Amino acid sequence: MNVFRPAWLSAMLLAIFASPATLADDHMLNGMEVSQPFNVQANLCKLNPGVTLDDYHAMVEDYFDWAEKYDVEPVFVRQFPLFSHQNMQRPWPYDFVEFLASEYEPWGKSWDLWLTTEDGMALNERWQSLAVCHVKQAHGQVLYADTEALENDDERYVSWNWCTAKVGFEQLSQKHAEYVAQISENPSGLIGWALMFPHTGAADAPGDFAHLAIYPDLESFMAR
């Protein structure tokens, strides 16, 4: 499940080799242009001992105010594992993962401000006192989106499928285009489809890129 701010994003993610997005109305989601690649930051977080999610989210709310002050607001999503790969031998090391999506240059500006302004550095210190978060960067692009369905609620279910390409750019792009055409004709409960391609800090990623499928509920997920 996800906690959204402003309202949508889990599928934010990628592909330098992706076909253009197919959106129900236009190319904007929550005021962000998503028909072209954009940056996605992933924060893989474990709360420090004694810290609650409410404690942590109070800091995040202050971050939203800070980002608005400097005009560097991202689209924000928090994901919690529901059906994970963890077991006794391979426990999941994080409590949640956050995704912050933005155009590239504004996101670079936000990091400069985060590391150099007095209030940014204070928030950074507070953040690190609450949780250990491993920060990664990725390219993102939405391939298919039912904008109305994505924006009418703040909780979604997202499946991840990590992949390693066995074909070249043209073949992969063609397959994506074919699948987008099929989804557009018959979504079968799917309300969003996107890709993520890590570009910084993810040398140990489980694949070269990930497909993300977004559903409004678990009934839709199981139906596919």
Go through each PLM region and give its residues:
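Bacterial N-terminal signal peptides that target proteins for export
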Residues: 1-10
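Bacterial N-terminal signal peptides
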Residues: 10-18
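Short S/T/G/P-rich N-terminal loop/turn motif that feeds into the first structured element of a domain
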Residues: 13, 23-224
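Generic extreme N-terminus detector
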Residues: 4-5, 17, 23
